[in-house]
Amino acid sequence: MLDNKIHYRTCNLCEAMCGLEITYKEKKVISIVGDKKDPLSKGFICPKSLALKDLYEDPDRLKTPIKRTENGWQEISWTEAFDEVEIQIKKIQEKYGNNAVATYQGNPNVHNVGSMLYGGPFLKSLKTKQKYSATSADQLPHHIASLKMFGHQMLIPIPDIERTDYLLILGANPGASNGSLLTAPGFPQKIKSIQKRGGKVINIDPRFTETSKISSQHLYINPGKDALFLLSLLHVIFDQGIEEKTHLSNYLKGLEEIKEIVKEYSPKKTALLIGIDSLEIQKIAKDFMNSKTAVCYGRMGVSTQEYGGICQWLINVLNIVTNNMDKVGGAMFTKPAIDLVYMTGIQGKVGNFDRYRSRVHNLPEYSGELPVATLADEILTEGDGQIKMFICTAGNPVLSAPNGKKMEKALEKLDFMVSIDIYLNETSKYANIILPTTNGLETLHYDLVFHQLAIRNTAKLSEILFEKDENQKHDWQILNELTERITGKKNPLTPEMMLDNMFKFSSYKAANLSVKKLKENPSGIDLGALQPLLTKRIFTQDKKINI
């Protein structure tokens, strides 16, 4: 016991950013418990955090490059692996064009600071339009709504659940997930806190979920009818009359058009299709607009459906017209220590939509990516621009993308495939070469993305707990090497150096944030509750919110 040491870090296995207190001895984890000093999670953890120990100790985890041969998988050196990947990229692009090489980024990329900092330059170096990620099978409607309404793809409203009086949840199960595009560790307890202070939590879902069990009320809705439900709520609200002058009134564009659109969606007309009684719809609308503070939140169930984009747009409209947008207890916006929205926004890098289309199905791009639903057909369909090589980073699209069987057939047809992954799985088994990264406890970690989506502004750096084996490589080292092989240029900065440079642009000047200071405060630094700031963050050309 005397030799045991304590390490503090953030769990990076989901979006909740739970703080961990890890007891260890030498290179063995003794226990993992919640860090009560973490300003965001305050001691809460879920069972997933224990998997960090399992991942570190897993004998099946790859640590050295492997190559598929006629005699099975064989270990090879990093030099041989990089040489082969470089040769194949250059050969295939020279023969078939840049777009013959496709990439896919799985969700773990945004949970790893190395991938976030070095992945972009690698993708750019390939000069291909055939880029894909989990985004189009997940949260794309959120980004499109934010881009079109507020002018920036990452300006995503965050429900202020710790100060709201009324929480309306559609197609989300934060009781199990602890929030998605809403980083809120300990979400079930926060639901109970709303109720304890006299508030209500209404859950609209075709299923009775973990969230339904602890909500004030659960109502079943017919699948895919969420847009009708939201239009009907707005019909009632406009019929009742909204407060014409709010702090956002001078920034709104399109309010009269919205009023006209929703006139046709009376609950009496739509209730049967929605599957919720018209009186219930009216009551929810009136309660929402009459609550001191209220916020509507919708996630996967309203995003991954035919009307996903419409749903996320209408959720924003509902929060805006009831004077609950950019307001304490409503939908708010973060100001993280490393403020990606501000840093990219002032450079005009706010996101893009429909600049070009996919080759086979004529589907629009989003910020340089095409929908993953068309990836298999882009490989299988012959002709100019056909994908011949595929680079998959921390993803398993055979399981996670639409039509996994077709994806398998497509991967079998490739001339060459590379997986950057720690496991031999349903997708990586089709690769010619697998480049494994370090993982979890072997890595430096700072959440660049999820601080942008959290219910409180905090900053926390997790140092490496266990040094990697001599033959292992971090994700940033792999991506940096591949970029150099293609461009001849190598980024000389380490992740710590890059983070320090980014902290120099932090708006929290008084906090004097740096990698060194965060290392001195391993449980994290509290930067305060969310504050109204949208009017200073609108990136549309006319500085209006296009509702």
Model region roles, listed by residue range:
Residues 172-173, 214-215, 265-268, 297-302, ...:
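Flexible glycine/proline-enriched surface loops and loop-helix/loop-strand junctions
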Residues 441-468, 478, 483, 487-488:
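Glycine/threonine-rich phosphate-binding loop and adjacent beta-strand/alpha-helix elements that clamp
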Residues 69-74, 240-278, 465-534:
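N-terminal leader/propeptide and maturation segments of large enzyme subunits in energy/redox metabolism
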Residues 1-240, 254, 269, 277, ...:
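N-terminal export/assembly segments and adjacent metallocofactor-ligating motifs
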Residues 116-192, 199-204, 228-231, 319-430, ...:
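Extended redox/cofactor-interaction regions of prokaryotic respiratory oxidoreductases
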Residues 96-100, 243-248, 295, 326-333, ...:
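Flexible, glycine/charged-enriched surface loops at secondary-structure junctions
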